[in-house]
Amino acid sequence: MEKHGNYNINKICVIGLGYIGLPTASMLANHGYEVVGVDVNEKRVNQIKNGELKIEEPGLLTLVKGAINSKNLNVQTSATEADAFIICVPTPALENEDGSKKCDLTYVMGAVQNIIPFLKEGNLIVIESTIPPEITKKIYETIDKKIYVAHCPERVLPGKILKELVENDRIIGGINKKSAEMAKEIYKSFVEGKIYITDSNTAEMVKLMENTYRDINIALANEFAKICDEIGVNVWDAIKIANKHPRVNILNPGPGVGGHCISIDPWFIVEKTNNAKFIRAARELNDNMPAYVCKSVLSELKKHGIKKPKISVFGATYKGNVEDTRESPSKNVIEMLLKNGVTVSTFDPHATCFEYPLSTLDECISGSDCIVVLTDHDAFKNIKKDDIDEICPKLKNKIVFDTKNILEHNLWKRAGFTVKLLGNGAW
């Protein structure tokens, strides 16, 4: 194995082989490092060994197979000795009694404990998992060995992970300068974007700021949508025109915010301080959008005198063209509809695992009173006249509620549908 850089880091142990860990481990292996990928899920490890991925990500299977075939990547269920350890495990949110949330560090601290027996003096630990400020230092303080620790938060978008792993800028924060420089040595092997060096607290805060900014922007759009519903304005048209201003960039409204980052990360700031009232308000507004959508749909059904309705939900994933359902607003919308006595059937062309049963398209629309679009999959955007003509005979009533503004509304109207759009009070 060739020597990499100035710090004799040749063998890397990556803990966690999910959406971030597996691509990172494979990327490093394909760039000459000896990599051991570790995951406590034995089934996942065996699937990776057999070239069977449950992660729907363009190019990932080819990358993983190349890494394994090169003999640079081995996957197993337990940690091992290495020169550097990269932790890529989930940091979900735990709900507090007051409805706020805080970071669940169970998986991160568990990963740290699992690698401690294998640590040698001079080793490096890199935390990629998103964590609250001051946690990297806390991890360093729990280890009674002379090692180096850095935080290099992941910054990739599902569906574009491999492209963004290479092209995106990265931030690396060390508990000291050498920790950051050692981590930079690893990442510059495949990162073509700029790598910014700072302290660990700043790196932690930067990642949280990035996603909090987007969450607040979406909350603003969602509040505009509610206002426009009330005063008779199409929020989508208004946002489009407002964004013509060179210093305005309002994001789109929707049924809520999901995924493993934007819907969770702002809470990691809120838990650290009482000065995050604006951040908390935005988070709560976005969390309440599923209830607003549910109320709007039920109101429309009531106008049509529909009792004991069946609703077809289009979309279970948290965003378009991915199979990831984590923190998806669809789950909350469905839960609220069910509590109101509605029969719900869900169709998603990408999702394979969801909290509620997934149906085929025909099963989903059969006898339905209303179609509610919650995810902006291309499969839904590309519904054409012939598709609508096939759908119509299977429905009981023709109502469609578009929360993402992706349908060709005129096509549906010409087919006899009542079309409702989130945030369009002009209709």
Swiss-Prot record:
<dbReference type="InterPro" id="IPR001732">
    <property type="entry name" value="UDP-Glc/GDP-Man_DH_N"/>
</dbReference>
<dbReference type="InterPro" id="IPR014026">
    <property type="entry name" value="UDP-Glc/GDP-Man_DH_dimer"/>
</dbReference>
<feature type="binding site" description="in chain A">
    <location>
        <position position="318"/>
    </location>
    <ligand>
        <name>UDP-N-acetyl-alpha-D-mannosaminouronate</name>
    </ligand>
</feature>
<feature type="active site" description="Nucleophile">
    <location>
        <position position="261"/>
    </location>
</feature>
<feature type="binding site" description="in chain B">
    <location>
        <position position="326"/>
    </location>
    <ligand>
        <name>NAD(+)</name>
    </ligand>
</feature>
<feature type="binding site" description="in chain A">
    <location>
        <position position="130"/>
    </location>
    <ligand>
        <name>NAD(+)</name>
    </ligand>
</feature>
<feature type="binding site" description="in chain B">
    <location>
        <position position="247"/>
    </location>
    <ligand>
        <name>UDP-N-acetyl-alpha-D-mannosaminouronate</name>
    </ligand>
</feature>
<keyword id="KW-0520">NAD</keyword>
<feature type="binding site" description="in chain A">
    <location>
        <position position="404"/>
    </location>
    <ligand>
        <name>UDP-N-acetyl-alpha-D-mannosaminouronate</name>
    </ligand>
</feature>
<feature type="binding site" description="in chain A">
    <location>
        <position position="258"/>
    </location>
    <ligand>
        <name>UDP-N-acetyl-alpha-D-mannosaminouronate</name>
    </ligand>
</feature>
<dbReference type="GO" id="GO:0016628">
    <property type="term" value="F:oxidoreductase activity, acting on the CH-CH group of donors, NAD or NADP as acceptor"/>
</dbReference>
<dbReference type="InterPro" id="IPR036291">
    <property type="entry name" value="NAD(P)-bd_dom_sf"/>
</dbReference>
<dbReference type="GO" id="GO:0051287">
    <property type="term" value="F:NAD binding"/>
</dbReference>
<dbReference type="InterPro" id="IPR036220">
    <property type="entry name" value="UDP-Glc/GDP-Man_DH_C_sf"/>
</dbReference>
<feature type="binding site" description="in chain A">
    <location>
        <position position="214"/>
    </location>
    <ligand>
        <name>UDP-N-acetyl-alpha-D-mannosaminouronate</name>
    </ligand>
</feature>
<dbReference type="InterPro" id="IPR014027">
    <property type="entry name" value="UDP-Glc/GDP-Man_DH_C"/>
</dbReference>
<feature type="binding site" description="in chain B">
    <location>
        <position position="245"/>
    </location>
    <ligand>
        <name>UDP-N-acetyl-alpha-D-mannosaminouronate</name>
    </ligand>
</feature>
<feature type="active site" description="Proton donor/acceptor">
    <location>
        <position position="207"/>
    </location>
</feature>
<comment type="subunit">
    <text>Homotetramer; probably dimer of dimers.</text>
</comment>
<feature type="binding site" description="in chain A">
    <location>
        <position position="156"/>
    </location>
    <ligand>
        <name>UDP-N-acetyl-alpha-D-mannosaminouronate</name>
    </ligand>
</feature>
<feature type="binding site" description="in chain A">
    <location>
        <position position="20"/>
    </location>
    <ligand>
        <name>NAD(+)</name>
    </ligand>
</feature>
<comment type="similarity">
    <text>Belongs to the UDP-glucose/GDP-mannose dehydrogenase family.</text>
</comment>
<feature type="binding site" description="in chain A">
    <location>
        <position position="91"/>
    </location>
    <ligand>
        <name>NAD(+)</name>
    </ligand>
</feature>
<feature type="binding site" description="in chain A">
    <location>
        <position position="319"/>
    </location>
    <ligand>
        <name>UDP-N-acetyl-alpha-D-mannosaminouronate</name>
    </ligand>
</feature>
<dbReference type="GO" id="GO:0089714">
    <property type="term" value="F:UDP-N-acetyl-D-mannosamine dehydrogenase activity"/>
</dbReference>
<feature type="binding site" description="in chain A">
    <location>
        <position position="44"/>
    </location>
    <ligand>
        <name>NAD(+)</name>
    </ligand>
</feature>
<feature type="binding site" description="in chain A">
    <location>
        <position position="39"/>
    </location>
    <ligand>
        <name>NAD(+)</name>
    </ligand>
</feature>
<protein>
    <recommendedName>
        <fullName>UDP-N-acetyl-D-mannosamine dehydrogenase</fullName>
        <ecNumber>1.1.1.336</ecNumber>
    </recommendedName>
</protein>
<dbReference type="InterPro" id="IPR028359">
    <property type="entry name" value="UDP_ManNAc/GlcNAc_DH"/>
</dbReference>
<dbReference type="InterPro" id="IPR008927">
    <property type="entry name" value="6-PGluconate_DH-like_C_sf"/>
</dbReference>
<feature type="binding site" description="in chain A">
    <location>
        <position position="211"/>
    </location>
    <ligand>
        <name>UDP-N-acetyl-alpha-D-mannosaminouronate</name>
    </ligand>
</feature>
<dbReference type="GO" id="GO:0000271">
    <property type="term" value="P:polysaccharide biosynthetic process"/>
</dbReference>
<feature type="binding site" description="in chain A">
    <location>
        <position position="155"/>
    </location>
    <ligand>
        <name>UDP-N-acetyl-alpha-D-mannosaminouronate</name>
    </ligand>
</feature>
<dbReference type="Pfam" id="PF00984">
    <property type="entry name" value="UDPG_MGDP_dh"/>
</dbReference>
<feature type="binding site" description="in chain A">
    <location>
        <position position="207"/>
    </location>
    <ligand>
        <name>UDP-N-acetyl-alpha-D-mannosaminouronate</name>
    </ligand>
</feature>
<feature type="binding site" description="in chain A">
    <location>
        <position position="19"/>
    </location>
    <ligand>
        <name>NAD(+)</name>
    </ligand>
</feature>
<dbReference type="InterPro" id="IPR017476">
    <property type="entry name" value="UDP-Glc/GDP-Man"/>
</dbReference>
<dbReference type="Pfam" id="PF03721">
    <property type="entry name" value="UDPG_MGDP_dh_N"/>
</dbReference>
<keyword id="KW-0560">Oxidoreductase</keyword>
<dbReference type="Pfam" id="PF03720">
    <property type="entry name" value="UDPG_MGDP_dh_C"/>
</dbReference>
<comment type="function">
    <text>Catalyzes the four-electron oxidation of UDP-N-acetyl-D-mannosamine (UDP-ManNAc), reducing NAD(+) and releasing UDP-N-acetylmannosaminuronic acid (UDP-ManNAcA).</text>
</comment>
